[in-house]
């Protein structure tokens, strides 16, 4: 069996990265930004300032990553003739962003607001019904085109979310090791690469 690693096309991390968003997206004229109501006032003004040369449409997430929500956002993307979809928020916002990018055939940029989710880098969206019960996994052909992590945003998130992210980073090493030594199949239907295992080691080392 072959070995394969999946990763975003570009990963960028640093303090005040939201201020650089205009440079990251300078090749696009029309942009849709998906975020939640509780994050709108916190982040949209910064993003609007950074994207002042672009035409931006803000879409407020309606509480669930469901097919009806994905279709609603996709319709807005198509109606505004937007060229790229940006997701700002937690796991469900980012999963919705990834699914919309897939169905609308548009590049996506994800900006996580907490360390407690794997959604930013994965090639997977977890889809629910509108009543919040599980529907299905949507396996995507690739990870996001860009992941932008503003460390100031992550640091300002609720402490419980940072703790959860640290715990997840710590446990990833043991999960990766079990898969690596047993030659188990990963979500890409291949075996774990040495580089992926090395990243999991670095994750553990950074939080110990």
Predicted regions and their residues:
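Conserved small/polar residues in nucleotide/adenosyl-binding loops
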Residues: 205-208
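Short, glycine/charged-enriched secondary-structure capping and boundary segments
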Residues: 27, 46-49, 73, 100-103, ...
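A glycine/threonine-rich phosphate-anchoring loop and its flanking beta-alpha core
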Residues: 104-202
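Alpha-helical scaffold segments in soluble metabolic enzymes
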Residues: 20-24, 46, 72, 99, ...
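A short, small-residue-rich loop immediately preceding and capping a beta-strand
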Residues: 77-115
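Fold-independent oxyanion-binding glycine-rich loops
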Residues: 9, 15, 35-37, 88-90, ...
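Short glycine/serine/threonine-rich phosphate/pyrophosphate-binding segments
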Residues: 40-44, 92-98, 117-121
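ATP/NTP phosphate-donor binding region
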Residues: 1-84
């Amino acid at each position: 069996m072959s070995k394969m690693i999946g990763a975003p096309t570009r990963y960028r991390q640093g303090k005040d990265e939201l201020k650089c968003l205009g440079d990251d997206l300078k090749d696009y004229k029309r942009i849709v930004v998906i975020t939640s109501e509780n994050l709108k006032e916190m982040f949209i003004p910064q993003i609007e300032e950074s994207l002042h040369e672009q035409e931006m449409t803000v879409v407020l997430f309606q509480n669930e990553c469901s097919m009806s929500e994905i279709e609603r956002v996709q319709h807005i993307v198509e109606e505004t003739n937007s060229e790229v979809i940006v997701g700002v928020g937690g796991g469900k916002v980012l999963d919705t962003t990834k699914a919309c990018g897939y169905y609308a055939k548009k590049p996506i940029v994800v900006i996580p607001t907490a360390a407690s989710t794997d959604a930013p880098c994965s090639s997977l969206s977890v889809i629910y019904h509108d009543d919040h019960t599980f529907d299905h996994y949507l396996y995507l052909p690739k990870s996001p085109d860009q992941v932008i992590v503003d460390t100031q945003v992550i640091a300002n998130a609720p402490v419980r979310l940072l703790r959860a992210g640290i715990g997840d980073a710590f446990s990833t090493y043991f999960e990766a090791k079990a898969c690596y030594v047993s030659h188990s199949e990963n979500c890409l239907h291949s075996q774990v690469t040495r580089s992926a295992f090395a990243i999991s080691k670095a994750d553990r080392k950074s939080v110990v």
